[in-house]
């Protein structure tokens, strides 16, 4: 049984760790298993307005796939502007979720993409300590609670499968290799391969 995998790549720099490290590792592992793989490249796809055609294509890919891999750097304590636009325009109400009223002034989101499996890798230039403590892990918290639970529903795996790699521009080659080993092992688990 062949699975359908989609990877959303969100890095303008082809030499970045997101692009040349994480993204390429994901593609290599999925290709080795002969899974179907579609790629959304937010910095190479035609993204200027009007973008109705590309948004329609993205929605079709989201509908088609079983699993979504998201790879993005963190800029200013959030993902890149293009990823934020992707969330706004693809994961919109009516396609990805709807609000159901409980009272006149309170509603909750009902996700439409609960069947999708999601794994996310984000890279930080910052070290872990200040982000996890002083900033209360706001990047991951906002991403999982403010985006993913709306469209994919609440589940613990959204937290555990959202990985953050720290101080990426400053760490040693050995540390980057450890990060990529984590990615490789995660993908192999996802694909049902032995480690």
Write out the residue ranges for each language-model feature.
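Short, small-residue-biased leader/transition segments that mark boundaries at the very start
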Residues: 1-7
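Conserved alpha-helical elements of sugar-nucleotide-dependent glycosyltransferases
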Residues: 17-22, 139-143
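A short, Lys/Arg-enriched amphipathic alpha-helix followed by its capping loop at the start of a domain
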Residues: 21, 25-35
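A short beta-strand-loop structural module common to alpha/beta enzyme folds
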Residues: 34-47, 161-166
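N-terminal beta-loop-helix "entrance" segment that forms/cooperates
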Residues: 42-56, 172-176
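Glycine-rich, highly charged phosphate/nucleotide-binding loops
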Residues: 51-63, 179-186
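Helix-loop-strand module that forms the ligand-binding subsite of alpha/beta enzymes
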Residues: 54-144
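Glycine-rich phosphate/pyrophosphate-binding loop and the adjoining helix
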Residues: 130-195
């Amino acid at each position: 049984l062949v699975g359908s995998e989609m990877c959303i790549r969100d890095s303008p720099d082809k030499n970045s760790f997101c692009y040349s490290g994480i993204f390429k590792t994901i593609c290599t592992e999925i290709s080795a298993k002969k899974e179907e793989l579609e790629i959304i490249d937010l910095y190479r796809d035609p993204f200027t307005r009007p973008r109705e055609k590309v948004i329609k294509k993205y929605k079709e890919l989201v509908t088609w796939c079983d699993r979504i891999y998201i790879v993005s750097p963190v800029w200013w304590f959030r993902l890149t502007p293009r990823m934020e636009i992707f969330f706004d325009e693809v994961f919109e109400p009516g396609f990805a979720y709807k609000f159901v009223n409980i009272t006149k002034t309170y509603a909750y989101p009902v996700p439409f993409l609960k069947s999708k499996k999601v794994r996310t890798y984000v890279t930080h230039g910052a070290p872990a300590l200040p982000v996890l403590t002083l900033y209360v892990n706001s990047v991951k918290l906002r991403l999982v609670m403010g985006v993913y639970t709306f469209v994919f529903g609440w589940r613990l795996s959204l937290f555990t499968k959202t990985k953050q790699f720290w101080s990426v521009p400053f760490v040693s080659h050995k540390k980057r290799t450890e990060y990529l080993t984590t990615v490789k092992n995660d993908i192999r688990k996802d694909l049902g391969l032995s480690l």
